[in-house]
Amino acid sequence: MTSPAAPAATPVADKLPETLTEPNLPWMCICWDDPVNLMSYVTYVFQTVLGYSRKRATELMMQVHTEGKAVVSSGERDKVEGDVKKLQTAGLWATMQRADG
């Protein structure tokens, strides 16, 4: 009886997966227009949750209202994920996507 064959050696990857080697590109938090929330409430949320001045919060709210969406924050993935969660908790429609550089 012969001994079992040794397992074939698994080749070691020459490079790491792209997710580990890509630079940490900025991410964007996008707030979308919805038929539910009042403009005054959206402005209030931008002020209290994201820390914008009343003027800047109003500008962003008007962009959401007229264009259908606005980038309301950007940065590293963890920060933007937090902003999206906070806006969603406040009842706004928010998503995130990688900023194209």
From Swiss-Prot:
Coiled-coil annotated spans: none
A GO biological process held by the record: protein catabolic process
Source superkingdom: Bacteria
Quaternary assembly: Binds to the N-terminal domain of the chaperone ClpA.
Function, as annotated: Involved in the modulation of the specificity of the ClpAP-mediated ATP-dependent protein degradation.
Similarity remark: Belongs to the ClpS family.
Name used for this protein in its record: ATP-dependent Clp protease adapter protein ClpS
Species, as recorded: Corynebacterium jeikeium (strain K411)
